[in-house]
Design a protein with these regions (language model features):
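Glycine-rich active-site loop/strand segments that organize a redox cofactor
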Residues: 73-106
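Core beta-strand elements of the Rossmann-like FAD/NAD(P) dinucleotide-binding domain
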Residues: 21-24, 211-221
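Extreme N-terminal leader/targeting segments of oxidoreductases
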Residues: 1-26, 44-45, 49
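Glycine-rich loop(s) and the adjacent beta-strand/alpha-helix scaffold that form part
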Residues: 224-284, 467-480
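Glycine-rich FAD pyrophosphate-binding loop
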Residues: 45-68
Length: 566
């Protein structure tokens, strides 16, 4: 909704918007990988008399964390066992996980990866003599499903040419669910409980970001998958770099906030993810560590990770710190340890890595390798490639600095915060991990609110899903929601609020602005309201200084937390 000071050409907001009311059996809120998985899967199970609607605040082709593309799929079990996948996730998140959710996902995630390849996603392949083939060359070796071997950069990761990854997945979802069942450019802001049935989801309300319109949507069951939370903490990129973050800036924490406000239980929200990335451009480091075999150095040029001091520090966190693979959070801890000891900054030794790989390659292969170093960024973080150009950085000639980012809240990467959801209804799953509906049945990924499901970043205690796992969780949720809607076919959602009350709720910021913007000489500064940007800066300042942001090396105290809560 545009305000009167918006650039010429935008539609100005009005006091009384148009209202559109809808009612469906199944409502999907979100347009990222999880929601695309749900959109693709739902019609396989949907009855002829059942209806579905997907609502996205953006456009599905470039919505969610994968919008800019990826250069790898980080979760593909393949020849490994789901039990080993559970062990890996448990170790990386230092035991704070739901093994039932992780195991169940590990049994299903590969099917989504096979679908991605079937839809046209180029996946790198390994030849019999150990050569790596990317793009169309890799496709000639066949599919993963038919037995072709992927190029592994680790035990679980596979390389892709993924600039258009999200577009490929979104197209499949849109074709499956049907364009008539998709509502884009609609920002859902509140979930609504049923007026008669206690603790039962009944609908949602939101507004169009293109028109002066409010949407009120009733439903029997709903999935909310709107990503994690970014810009809670002040990013390292400020000034003209404002808006550059690692996770997508449009992940506003809606998944957690909206579900929490209707009573859904949260879990592990104290678990924040702080990835190490190339400084300022937030470029990914995974391919450099795993594919190019690069090492990190401290400011003295020492490979600190294997030093006696580092080993002694890791032993404090045994058994996780002494495991064969050091957990992500402890690798970051070692970086901070070096910096606090005065041995910073931390450097990615790209020069040595490419030189070592080049010893076994001819000139053509080496040139291709150098191109892949750039494409790794162009596939998923264009800003980092721009930064390398602006600073005359050639990775084969000049090393780059890496740095832990500001903290993010998420549940699909190397973090595990989110909503408490039901595990699968298997005998070995503890009863306290199963959430039963009022009919006594268990519906996997249902939250503590009846009929409210989630996936991807929304599922707490189950990290390391990444893009493929989020898509698979969306597909699992689709089947469970259809089952729920069929089991409660006689349920008629009834909203406690009137249409007028919901419009007042959604358009209160607009009306407050229209009533008061002429009071001051500049619309950004007014004693009667605060604009979103001003609210964001206040939140960032508080978390940055008191809430364990980068300003305090990610540390806080009980007194600091009391200040921020005030």
């Amino acid at each position: 909704m545009a305000l009167p000071n918006a650039p010429t050409g935008e539609l100005k907001a009005v006091r009384d918007p148009e209202v559109e009311e809808r009612e469906v059996d199944i409502l999907i809120v979100g347009g990222g990988m999880a929601a695309c998985g749900t959109a693709f899967e739902v019609h396989k199970w949907l009855g002829d008399d059942q209806s579905v609607l997907l609502v996205d605040k953006a456009a599905m082709e470039r919505s969610g964390a994968v919008a800019q593309g990826l250069s790898a799929i980080n979760t593909y079990v393949g020849e490994n066992a789901p039990e080993d996948y559970v062990r890996m996730v448990r170790n990386d998140l230092m035991g704070l996980v739901r093994e039932d959710l992780i195991f169940d996902l590990g049994c299903h995630v590969d099917d989504s990866v096979h679908l991605f390849e079937e839809w046209g996603l180029p996946i790198w392949k390994k030849t019999d003599d150990g050569k790596n083939l990317d793009g169309k060359k890799g496709q000639k070796l066949g599919t993963l499903k038919s037995g072709a071997q992927p190029v592994r950069t680790g035990k679980w990761q596979i390389m892709i040419n993924g600039e258009s990854y999200k577009r490929i997945v979104a197209e499949a979802g849109k074709l499956a669910i049907g364009e008539d069942n998709i509502l884009e450019r609609c920002f859902i802001v509140e979930l609504l409980l049923d007026a008669n049935e206690e603790n039962q989801i009944a609908g949602a309300v939101g507004f169009s970001v293109r028109e002066n319109k409010v949407f009120i949507i009733k439903c029997k069951t709903m999935m909310v998958a709107c990503g994690g939370a970014v810009n809670i903490y002040q990013p390292r990129s400020v000034g003209e770099g404002k808006g550059r973050a690692w996770y997508p800036v449009w992940n506003a924490g809606s998944t957690y906030t909206m579900c929490m406000k209707v009573g859904a239980e949260l879990t592990m929200m104290e678990n924040r993810f702080t990835p190490a990335r190339f400084k300022d451009g937030y470029g990914p480091v995974g391919a450099w560590f795993l594919l190019f075999k690069a090492k990190t150095l401290n400011g003295l040029g020492e490979p600190y990770a294997g030093s006696d001091a580092a080993k002694a520090e890791l032993e404090k966190y045994a058994p996780y710190g002494t495991a064969a693979i050091t957990p992500t959070c402890l690798r970051n801890h070692l970086m901070l340890f070096e910096m606090k000891e005065g041995r910073g900054p931390i450097i990615m030794d790209t020069v040595t890595a490419l030189a070592e790989l080049g010893k076994t390659m001819d000139k053509k292969e080496l040139k291709h390798l150098e191109s892949e170093a750039w494409e790794d960024f162009l596939d998923m973080t264009c800003g980092q490639a721009n930064l390398w150009c602006a600073t005359d950085t050639e990775p084969e000639k000049k090393n780059s600095e890496i740095m832990p980012t500001e903290p993010y809240l998420l549940g699909s990467h190397s973090g595990c915060c989110g909503l408490w959801t039901s595990g699968p209804d298997y005998d070995w799953v503890p009863e306290e991990y199963k959430i039963k509906a009022r009919n006594g049945k268990v519906y996997k990924q249902m939250t503590t609110v009846q009929g409210l499901f989630t996936a991807g970043d929304g599922v707490g205690g189950s990290g390391h899903k990444f893009s493929s796992g989020s898509h698979a969780e969306g597909r699992i949720a689709a089947k469970q929601m259809v089952r729920y809607a069929k089991d409660f076919a006689d349920f008629t959602p009834t909203l406690a609020q009137s249409k007028e009350e919901l419009v007042d709720l959604v358009y209160k910021p607009v009306r407050t602005f229209l009533d008061n913007y002429e009071y001051s000489t500049h619309v950004d500064f007014n004693p009667n309201y605060i604009k979103p940007e001003g609210m964001m800066y206040r939140l960032m300042k508080a978390t940055h200084e008191y809430g364990a942001g980068t300003a305090t090396y990610y540390m806080t105290t009980s007194k600091s937390l009391e200040i921020i809560m005030d």
